[in-house]
Amino acid sequence: MTTETRSLYSQLPAIDRLLRDSSFLSLRDTYGHTRVVELLRQMLDEAREVIRDSQTLPAWCENWAQEVDARLTKEAQSALRPVINLTGTVLHTNLGRALQAEAAVEAVAQAMRSPVTLEYDLDDAGRGHRDRALAQLLCRITGAEDACIVNNNAAAVLLMLAATASGKEVVVSRGELVEIGGAFRIPDVMRQAGCTLHEVGTTNRTHANDYRQAVNENTALLMKVHTSNYSIQGFTKAIDEAELVALGKELDIPVVTDLGSGSLVDLSQYGLPKEPMPQELIAAGVSLVSFSGDKLLGGPQAGIIVGKKEMIARLQSHPLKRALRADKMTLAALEATVRLYLHPEALSEKLPTLRLLTRSAEVIQIQAQRLQAPLAAHYGAEFAVQVMPCLSQIGSGSLPVDRLPSAALTFTPHDGRGSHLESLAARWRELPVPVIGRIYDGRLWLDLRCLEDEQRFLEMLLK
């Protein structure tokens, strides 16, 4: 060991001496003596490694208390941090999908603070069913006979198949063998549910006769899967649920549908593309319809199944139901969200998802122009800050082809270096409330469709 190396090691302080320093008193009060000591030991090991490898001291050795504070502050942050979503994707899976309505937030807080009648019947003091209140609401809205709630739509499809078709065949069009995020594939789910997939037709064309020819003594279900995250266009043919139900009645085989996103209102009345609604499929005679709670519905993550009473009863009594059931917080949020649909005239005001989806391009453009001047003044030395038209997307596999006209603030580096964009995006991710945009075509884009707290946004970006 060289004299220089010994000198560097000798500059490392003892933990006891550091702890006696007044700057560590508040750290010990905030984070606890044990955690502070653990971190100091770790930092001493790091410092020794740096000395050994590069014959120098880490820069933070000049102020140990400041480094400890920075590390413990970051460590104490929740893994689920609020962010400002300016990606242009409203229902962003990585950012938690639907924002919850205030009614849902209040319902969850109440359910967390006190015991609730989750499975308790106040009328007779007996045991109730956790799905009952929501089932009644969903039946009122969709016209179904009964309903079942699980923790997401993937679970809903798994339960639906396992409870009604295990050991038997399920007939599905080849054009509907979807894969969603996380490698969730209909053929894989069928295997897990104990079903045999019987695919019919071709990728782009499936006829009623294809289903008819596939039916045999081992057929349990005819299944439709809404292709919510892709679109097949051109020379295509698919039969709708009403036609498939008619065939199912003729052959005495139930029809079930995985609707995916699911919307309880006709979105076209808000200027959005129309999506099939559960109530339409129930009216057409479909036996079971499954859909998500946290996509177009605008509620918490949940899987909802509505349909015929005898079919729902089979789902409720299946062993998987207990493993997949929703907890009290999910049920509280979902019930509060579904209740908003009883008053559709106020829905776009009270449901954040619908409010964001229906923001007009003109309103967003005005907002962008209002923000452009102060941001250009602050960032203009390095970036050209412009207002540009863009197209938002709904996200989470909903309406994959359709885009929503919007407006964005774009930041283009004067020197054209992409590394400057990456650096700027990284700086914004370190803000108290991280701002998440997207880099595309040599610019950093901030699509303002989902920006509601304009003042907070400006305060952070102008610091």
Swiss-Prot record:
The modification N6-(pyridoxal phosphate)lysine is found at residue 295. Keywords: Cytoplasm, Protein biosynthesis, Pyridoxal phosphate, Selenium, Transferase. Its EC number is 2.9.1.1. The keyword Iron-sulfur does not apply. GO terms for cellular component: cytoplasm. It catalyses: L-seryl-tRNA(Sec) + selenophosphate + H(+) = L-selenocysteinyl-tRNA(Sec) + phosphate. It is found in: Cytoplasm. One of its GO terms (molecular function) is L-seryl-tRNA(Sec) selenium transferase activity. Its cofactor is pyridoxal 5'-phosphate. The keyword GTP-binding does not apply. It is an enzyme of class 2 (transferase). GO terms for biological process: conversion of seryl-tRNAsec to selenocys-tRNAsec; selenocysteine incorporation. Its main location: cytoplasm. Pathway: Aminoacyl-tRNA biosynthesis; selenocysteinyl-tRNA(Sec) biosynthesis; selenocysteinyl-tRNA(Sec) from L-seryl-tRNA(Sec) (bacterial route): step 1/1. It holds the Pfam family Se-cys_synth_N. PANTHER family: L-SERYL-TRNA(SEC) SELENIUM TRANSFERASE. Converts seryl-tRNA(Sec) to selenocysteinyl-tRNA(Sec) required for selenoprotein biosynthesis. Homodecamer; pentamer of dimers. Binds only one seryl-tRNA(Sec) per dimer. HAMAP family: SelA. Belongs to the SelA family. This is L-seryl-tRNA(Sec) selenium transferase. It comes from Escherichia coli O17:K52:H18 (strain UMN026 / ExPEC). The gene is selA.
